Amino acid sequence: EGYLERLIRAGFKVAICEQTEDPAAARKRGGKALVARDVVRLVTPGTLTEDSLLKARAHNHLAALARAGGNLGLAWLDMSTGDFTVALPGLGELPTLLVQVDPGELLVPEPLVEEPYLAEYGSLLTPLVASSFASTAGERRLCETYGVASLEAFGSFSRAEIGAAGAVIDYVLLTQKGRLPRLARPRCQEAQAVMAIDGATRRNLEVLEASGGGRRGSLLGVVDRTATGAGGRLLAARLAAPLTDIAGIGRRLDMVQALVEASGLRGKLVGALASCPDIERPLGRLSLERGGPRDLAAIRDGLECAIALRHLLHEDVGGLTPLPEDLVAAATALGEHNVLIGRLG
């Protein structure tokens, strides 16, 4: 993995070859026959799953830009966690959206490679033939992936968004040799749902990085007291794209206020979360048949933590004002996993 990290950081794509045949079978073909080997994976900057190649508290996005019917569609996937989002930015909004997404790799149709708004992403661009972004093929691929007859259940997507999302799925299938990680349903980010912060403003405000580079001294570095990698990634994503919806902001503030007032419960939750491993990324590796015993143990320990969190949120906390609906929903969604934990134990 040391060599792999160096090559990826330098912008290379790496083909992983493995032995695909038993030596005894090779000998049957002749005394000097070579054991069969094949490429089992292409490692690219946007398709990383190894913890050693990823930042624990930052997403690593594989993004795709498509054009259809005069519109631009952008889709981005964190292959290590399965988070999948699409958006329909105007040409003037695209640079700001790309800064928000901060892709590790950006798939683009060959005709768009020379567009001025992509100039600063030169080293991150992976040009593909225009047919890779066809919306009809993209819709078919998405329906096959999620096992649905149509995409209507997921929301209303433009042809450009579908083309971009389909290109992402196809590229993952190509690099993973026909395998797909665990994927969330594609979520549409509405243009006015989050605040647009352009690159210059983001740098001047030092939202995610300080002027000298790194988190230390940035807004994120100051406010990040999360106990888990997943929590750190969520906080960074929310700071990168602050809500503009008053109702949504109010719901978040209700949850903050409830936990500020319930200091005892808050302390117990922090203690429980501190022992909770990151299970999103182990799940992603296992779904690609790339995980190991350590990943299974992380999922077991994470599920035990989920049960503890669920019980804490349902405890009688001594006269506390009823928890906000979003916290109750989160507690319910944690579920019970005793049988699975037993099997993993």
What are these regions (language model features)?
Residues E1-E261, D278-G284, L288:
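Basic, polar low-complexity surface loops/patches
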Residues S263-R266:
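Conserved interaction-surface patches within small, structured recognition/assembly domains
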